[in-house]
Structure formats: structure tokens, C-alpha cells
Regions:
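Glycine- and other small-residue-rich loops at beta-strand/loop junctions that grip anionic moieties
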Residues: 1, 25, 94-95, 120, ...
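RNA substrate-binding interface of SAM-dependent RNA methyltransferases
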Residues: 11-14, 83-175
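N-terminal positively charged helical leader segments and presequences
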Residues: 1-83
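Short, acidic/turn-prone active-site loops that include or flank metal/cofactor-
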Residues: 27-28, 52-53, 122-124, 193-195, ...
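Active-site/ligand-binding-proximal alpha/beta "capping" segment
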Residues: 165-221
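Short acidic-hydrophobic, aromatic-tinged amphipathic segments that line or gate anion-handling sites
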Residues: 47-51, 143-151, 209
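Structured adenosyl-cofactor binding patch, chiefly the S-adenosyl-L-methionine
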Residues: 16, 133-138, 199-238
Length: 238
């Protein structure tokens, strides 16, 4: 993965990710550039000071005076997530296609201290620099599972004492999210930006919930909706 965001580089350094290359502009100086240099020296990460135009050639115009090439992000297995759980809170993302939404959801999930994020491999946004940037660098702290079959993963979670909560817009077959008892082991399913949670995953959910909102809008953005549910779960869990 290649990144040109200062916050992303700083988080990657803090999390001891493997840097293949790191270039820093000789013409930029601010406290975050100084922080990058300090962290590199503390963690023995090799970096090169280069002219600004050298970074622009690699990263394009949209960079912040740094450019890094990272080794691939580590992904986890669902078994690792379940066996090492602390909060008993997992987020399942069913075909989230927008990288901005994915990054924002990951940021909220890390802030809510989830044990892991399960992302469908098919019809989902790629894990790339945009996701890293919109997550404000928190992608490197997230424990992500790439799933080839969300239905099988949900079955596994149920077998390991998780309640699966699907989010929907329809109120006739669901309850308000705040009436669900999130103190139990919970896996929250968020659906595609346009289609929502698939009918199969709705059927496989133990409970469907909705978020009450003004009639002035049809629905919340999926990243906003995820934040609402995650922080209600965090509040209840204490």
C-alpha cells in the first residue's frame, strides 16, 4: 500500500508497520513532518529526504510532503477475532462500496473499541490509501477479516454465543436500535449504501433494528448509521 498522508504515515509508524520506502520532502517543515522524522529515528525506520517534485512524481499532487510504500496490511481470521475478544463487539460490513464510507466506518469502529471488522470480499471497496486517509490512519489499528462468505461467518459467530443484529430501514419488522441489549456478545451488520443488508443476511440475523430519524430524510449515510449503533453498544457495555 502506498500512502501520502501525514496522519496515515504517523499512525503506521506508531503501529510498527513495515515500511519498504519512505520519502520526506526537503521543502516542507511543520510539527507533523518533525514528528515523522522523530518516529523514524526512534523506530529505526530508514527514510530519504528528497525534493518536493520527487514525491509529486510518485504520489501525484495530492500529498502532504511524504510518500511511503508499506508492506501489505495484516488481515485476521474470524477465529482469531472471536478467541481474543474483549468487548464482545464485532462489526460486519455487507458490500460497502465507497472507500470514503469504509474509512469513516473503520474510524468509528476503532473508536468504539470493536474486537474486529468483517468485510465481504465481493462487491466491497478495496483497502487502499483512500480508506487509510479517511480512517484518519486508524486502519492500521483495526483487526480486519476479509470474508468470502458472510453467511458462514454469521453461523460461526452464533455458534460462539454472538447475537447478530442486522440494520434495516423498515420499522414493521424491526425494533429501535436502543431497545436492543448490546451487553451480550454482539455482531452488528451494516449493509450496502444503496441496497442495505442483503435479504439472506437479514434472514440470518437474530434481531433487526432501525434508527429513528426525521421524515425529512429517507435514511442516514451508512457511516453515520454505523457510528450511532457502535457508540450505543459501547455505552451499554460500559
Amino acid at each position: 500500500m502506498n500512502i501520502g498522508s501525514l496522519n496515515s504515515v504517523i499512525e503506521a509508524l506508531r503501529e510498527n508497520l513495515q515500511f519498504n520506502k519512505l520519502f520526506i520532502s526537503t521543502s516542507r517543515r511543520d510539527h507533523r513532518i518533525d514528528k515523522v522524522i522523530k518516529l523514524c529515528r526512534e523506530k529505526n525506520v530508514v527514510f530519504q529526504m528528497v525534493p518536493e517534485e520527487a514525491i509529486t512524481r510518485k504520489a501525484g499532487e495530492d500529498h502532504q510532503g511524504v510518500y511511503a510504500e508499506l508492506s501489505p496490511i495484516r488481515f485476521y481470521s474470524i477465529e482469531e477475532i472471536v478467541s481474543n475478544r474483549k468487548k464482545g463487539l464485532i462489526l460486519i460490513l455487507d458490500s460497502i462500496t465507497d472507500t470514503g464510507n469504509l474509512g469513516a466506518i473503520i474510524r468509528s469502529a476503532v473508536a468504539a473499541d470493536v474486537d474486529g471488522i468483517i468485510i465481504s470480499l465481493r462487491n466491497s471497496a478495496p483497502i487502499n490509501e483512500t480508506v487509510l486517509k479517511t480512517s484518519a490512519g486508524t486502519l492500521v489499528k483495526a483487526k480486519i477479516v476479509q470474508s468470502g462468505n458472510l453467511s458462514q461467518d454469521i453461523k460461526y459467530l452464533k455458534e460462539n454465543d454472538f447475537w447478530v443484529v442486522g440494520t434495516v430501514m423498515e420499522r414493521d419488522k424491526s425494533i429501535p436500535y436502543y431497545k436492543f441489549d448490546f451487553t451480550v456478545n454482539t455482531a452488528i451488520v451494516m449493509g450496502n449504501e444503496f441496497k442495505g443488508v442483503s435479504p439472506l443476511l437479514q434472514k440470518n440475523s437474530d434481531q433487526l433494528v432501525y434508527i429513528p430519524h426525521s421524515e425529512a430524510i429517507d435514511s442516514l449515510n451508512v457511516s453515520a448509521a454505523a457510528a450511532v449503533l457502535l457508540f450505543e453498544a459501547l455505552r451499554q457495555k460500559g
